[in-house]
UniProtKB/Swiss-Prot annotation:
The keyword Cell membrane applies. One of its GO terms (cellular component) is plasma membrane. Plays a role in cell envelope biogenesis, maintenance of cell envelope integrity and membrane homeostasis. Keywords: Cell inner membrane, Cell membrane, Membrane, Transmembrane, Transmembrane helix. It comes from Polynucleobacter asymbioticus (strain DSM 18221 / CIP 109841 / QLW-P1DMWA-1) (Polynucleobacter necessarius subsp. asymbioticus). The gene is yciB. Belongs to the YciB family. This is Inner membrane-spanning protein YciB. It is a multi-pass membrane protein. Its main location: membrane. The keyword Transmembrane applies. It is found in: Cell inner membrane.
Length: 182
């Protein structure tokens, strides 16, 4: 359910684009993200860092798109977000010995202790590489295809690739998970 809730602004962006174009869709995405953040705060009295980053990104890139009447900015927003995530994962692991994937998932998953550090490191690198790739893919779709193709890719293509990556990661992780003794 959280996954669908996280898609709320993207789905509304897609629908608004189909009825009103890129500028109306951008405004709808900005408003939807604000509403989403307010709802999360109302329900949990807390907003996590990734939600703040997403809000700031949509407000900055969306505002530039609207005020300069140039859709290039909204086309670049996913790449900026993907590369920010990629960079944070990579730099924090390589230079600060902080594995954000382990921080986010470590309480839910217990790995076999013999090689847990290596597995978490590989998983962190895989996510960093995935986000880096997605940033380039977004640029390619945004500037080599029509705006409508990019909008379709933003909802269906990038979401589909994310789901496929999570499933593949799940299969890979299943070999390394410690199962409780029965």
């Amino acid at each position: 359910m959280k996954f669908l809730f996280d898609l709320f602004p993207i789905i509304l962006f897609f629908i608004a684009y189909k009825f009103g174009g890129i500028y109306q869709a951008t405004i709808v995405a900005m408003v939807a993200t604000i509403v989403q953040i307010l709802w999360v705060y109302y329900r949990h009295r807390k907003i996590d860092a990734m939600q703040w980053v997403s809000l700031i990104m949509i407000m900055v890139f969306g505002s530039l798109t609207i005020f300069l009447h140039d859709s290039t900015f909204i086309l670049l927003k996913p790449t900026a977000l993907y590369w920010l995530f990629s960079g944070v994962l990579f730099v924090s692991a390589q230079f600060f010995n902080k594995n954000w994937i382990q921080v986010l998932m470590g309480k839910q998953i217990t790995l076999k202790p013999t090689h847990a550090h290596t597995v978490w490191h590989q998983l962190n690198l895989a996510w960093s590489a995935f986000f880096f790739f997605m940033g380039f893919l977004n640029l390619y779709i945004a500037f080599e295809y029509s705006e409508e193709t990019w909008v379709n890719f933003k909802l269906f293509g990038s979401t589909g690739l994310l789901i496929a990556f999570v499933i593949a990661q799940g299969f890979w992780m299943s070999r390394h998970i410690e199962h409780p003794a029965e």
